């Protein structure tokens, strides 16, 4: 619901380290299908590959595409399902079935032909199809594991990366800078300027905070280290909360546009104890996504366990009416309201 409400059109699964997480994406496809069946909206899906790209692409094709599973969720580009894989590594079957784009990593900040950028320094280069002057794709990232000084690749844990507070060529270390999304905002400016058909945002969440060893460093975290040096948009408890989610919403709306706000209907007096039909003339209707009261119960890191059973009532549609003396509220539920005690 969060992604669809934000205006996200396609969810790109990161399978760049060879693992495809089949159980995970299949479950998401199942849930997306259920959401659509109940009247909701979801993004389309595709995958990005890198390590052993050819084998990864073949596995994805065999498990999902060849049997035709969840066909209505496949993201289409140039008349075929899109897959981000190096054409030089792809099998003939994959080449024939998909529209291919190569993943471009931030080792070189150049515009790229038929290659989509995973991450880049501001002002970001872009990917193009045939005409180098016509952008096809640009990346917008919350933060980058790229050095503040020269844009070269670094680890998020080294202290020199372009974290969430980087902007105007420097790391902003002022109190509360993390709350403002300066880096993310700067990247969005470039996307609005280029206005390509594809803006790829990195990223919704990081699957794991990988700990590595480096020469001279006993501990190194490449992609995710702390609140500043990470690039999750997904909300957190405490800290920056849902700031980056709403910044994503703002960025997408400025890029794609948004519908005009509906006008309110004329004043009307509602007789509380009479038929609900009197609400038919009241506009606008505010709709909530269905199926969002499901209890959450899942293991976290180490011994942590996350549980939330507070969702009770499925509230679907809302209206507000007014006259000279009163304001009236209407709420339609999916099922009978649960008791207050």
Question: Predicted regions: what is each one?
Answer:
Residues 1-271, 275-276, 283:
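Glycan-processing catalytic domains of CAZymes
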Residues 270-341:
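Surface-exposed, glycine/proline- and aromatic-rich loop segments on solvent-exposed faces
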């Amino acid at each position: 619901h969060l992604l669809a409400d934000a205006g996200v059109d396609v969810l790109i699964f990161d399978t760049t380290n060879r693992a495809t997480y089949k159980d995970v994406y299949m479950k998401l496809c199942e849930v997306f299908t259920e959401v659509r069946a109940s009247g909701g909206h979801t993004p389309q899906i595709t995958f990005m590959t890198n390590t052993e790209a050819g084998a990864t692409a073949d596995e994805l094709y065999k498990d999902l595409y060849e049997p035709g599973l969840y066909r209505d969720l496949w993201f289409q580009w140039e008349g075929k399902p899109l897959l981000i894989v190096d054409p030089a590594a792809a099998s003939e079957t994959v080449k024939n079935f998909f529209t291919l784009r190569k993943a471009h990593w931030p080792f070189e900040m150049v515009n790229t032909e038929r290659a989509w950028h995973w991450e880049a320094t501001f002002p970001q280069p872009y990917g193009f199809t045939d005409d180098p002057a016509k952008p096809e794709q640009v990346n917008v990232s919350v933060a980058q594991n790229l050095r503040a000084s020269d844009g070269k690749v670094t680890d998020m844990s080294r202290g020199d990366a372009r974290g969430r507070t980087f902007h105007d060529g420097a790391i902003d270390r002022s109190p509360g800078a993390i709350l403002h999304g300066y880096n993310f905002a700067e990247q969005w400016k470039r996307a609005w300027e280029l206005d390509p058909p594809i803006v790829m945002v990195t990223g919704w969440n990081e699957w794991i905070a990988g700990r590595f060893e480096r020469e001279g460093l006993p501990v190194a975290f490449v992609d995710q280290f702390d609140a500043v040096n990470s690039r999750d948009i997904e909300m957190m408890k405490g800290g920056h909360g849902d700031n980056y989610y709403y910044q994503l919403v703002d960025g997408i709306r400025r890029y794609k546009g948004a519908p005009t706000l509906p006008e309110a209907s004329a004043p009307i007096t509602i007789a509380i104890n009479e038929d609900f039909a009197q609400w038919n003339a009241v506009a606008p209707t505010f709709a909530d996504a269905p199926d969002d009261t499901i209890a959450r119960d899942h293991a976290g890191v180490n011994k942590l366990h996350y549980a939330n059973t507070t969702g009770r009532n499925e509230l679907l549609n809302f209206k507000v009416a007014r006259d000279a003396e009163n304001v009236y509220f209407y709420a339609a539920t999916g099922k009978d309201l649960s008791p207050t005690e």
